[in-house]
Amino acid sequence: MTDAPVSRIRNFCIIAHIDHGKSTLADRLLQDTGTVANRDMQEQFLDNMDLERERGITIKLQAARMNYTAADGEEYVLNLIDTPGHVDFSYEVSRSLQACEGALLVVDASQGVEAQTLANVYLALENDLEIIPVLNKIDLPGADPDRIKEEVEAIIGLDCSKAIPCSAKTGLGVPEILQAVVDRVPAPKDAVEEPTKALIFDSYYDPYRGVIVYFRVMSGRINCKDKVLLMASKKTYELDEIGIMAPDQKKVDELHAGEVGYLAASIKAVADARVGDTITLLNAPADEPLPGYTEAKPMVFCGLFPTEADQYPDLREALNKLQLSDAALQFEPETSSAMGFGFRCGFLGLLHMEIVQERLEREYDLDLIVTAPSVIYKVNMIDGTEVMVDNPATLPDPQKRESIEEPYVKMEIYAPNDYNGALMGLCQERRGEYLDMKYITTDRVTLIYELPLAEVVTDFFDQMKTRTQGYASMEYHLIGYRKNELVRLDVLINGERADPLTTIVHRDKAYNVGKALVEKLKELIPRQQFKIPLQASIGSRIIASTSISAIRKDVLAKCYGGDISRKKKLLKKQAKGKKRMKAMGKVDVPQEAFMAVLKLNDSP
């Protein structure tokens, strides 16, 4: 049993945009409270995936318990729950916020408020969290704390008179932050005697002990000898151990309301202990689960194929293992005439897709070909049924379908005023519908647009950063489906349809996209000994075509002068060979060609 009374527990998280110093601040808090000895300290202590350290982002949630002696001489338990800052992982963020009573809002004193910070702040306000503004990086020469305070007050409406200036790098202001957490974050509700409910805010897969679940006890208590029931998945488990993260796992006998801990119960896969599920006791279950549980739905799909056919079983095993620790990843087998066997995978967003792909290549040593990402389309058939299509190649024939609907998102882009025109141009190109424009401060603006998700998942983010020299940031959420004039654009290479290059585009853009695509492929596919026609088609109608000319071997090199009929015979023989080659020959399409769909920046 941990001995902290509920009144001396503080649960808080850190909200920050990528690169505003969240993980560094977490490091300093751990160091200042003596939770991690100075000699054990390494940068970004809570980001324990190599990929997280390299990209400087937090992907999986972590939690750490710190003991802190406050100014009043009492010892407090501070539970820091780390949150991912990226838009793809917003569901995980919302669950971790539910486990807290307060949040540190970290804003870079030289850059100001960014889109993802805002999205998370609104989530925190919905959960009634006490928000403490922290201005980080005040040791930088470009820092302007007064301007940033005004900005936070203008945009979020928070009172910044008590904002804490700090530098997580040097440790300046960290003791004040710890004291502010004790003074300003409310203690958890004292609900020890109520029926047991605990919220799962994260889980990860341990190859030896099964799934380790991180949870926050909302009411009641959990003992290490209890049998528990997970209310959403209806599964029951006998606990092997429970404990606290300090920040390494430490076993305890019991945890009560307000505390944060972990449990191990030989759970086979993360999908059995979903983030947001409610843990209760089997012999005295709660009447209803905690609110807000939803299953993470994939938004972006792509095909993953091994470059070598014999790696297919390895890819399947790697995906199975990854799914144990990533419940949002979905996959099913698919075959393609051009690529052989592979998998169709579903992801939360583009970043999630990149991370999964990188982990497969890095941790499982696989060489992969990845097709261009697509979204889920809703196809209304003539017979009145609805079909959901996540692979453009499987779109039903035009004769059978009545209309196609595509997902739309509402997007907010935050950027300096100077880049207004460039951003509006980009949104216009991507079939965006203008909703509103708000001036946050005299030189920063918010653009609000509605766009088709398909236009966002390709290279929208890269383009936005390029056109604004990296200053813009965006945040979007799904708002539903809308009917549009959409067609399937097929690419034929040497007369054969290349499934991975099939895309669904708006009818008005089809010709330009088709033309740009075949031109791009012409650059990327190496020349062969025979001529390769490249065509883009809608149904049976070819809308754009070009061809890669053959490499010609000079068969007349050995003929010095002499009879013309001899030369004709050799040329005829060569033409015959090329004809046979063209009929039999397979064209090797390099990986870059499959990503060509993404890089059609020159298409309007």
From Swiss-Prot:
GO terms for molecular function: GTP binding; GTPase activity; ribosome binding. The keyword Oxidoreductase does not apply. It is an enzyme of class 3 (hydrolase). One of its GO terms (cellular component) is plasma membrane. It comes from Synechococcus sp. (strain WH7803). CDD domains: EF4_II, EF4_III, LepA, lepA_C. It is a peripheral membrane protein. Residues 7-189 form the tr-type G domain. Keywords: Cell inner membrane, Cell membrane, GTP-binding, Hydrolase, Membrane, Nucleotide-binding, Protein biosynthesis. Required for accurate and efficient protein synthesis under certain stress conditions. May act as a fidelity factor of the translation reaction, by catalyzing a one-codon backward translocation of tRNAs on improperly translocated ribosomes. Back-translocation proceeds from a post-translocation (POST) complex to a pre-translocation (PRE) complex, thus giving elongation factor G a second chance to translocate the tRNAs correctly. Binds to ribosomes in a GTP-dependent manner. Its EC number is 3.6.5.n1. This is Elongation factor 4. The gene is lepA. Belongs to the TRAFAC class translation factor GTPase superfamily. Classic translation factor GTPase family. LepA subfamily. Signal peptide: none annotated. It is found in: Cell inner membrane.
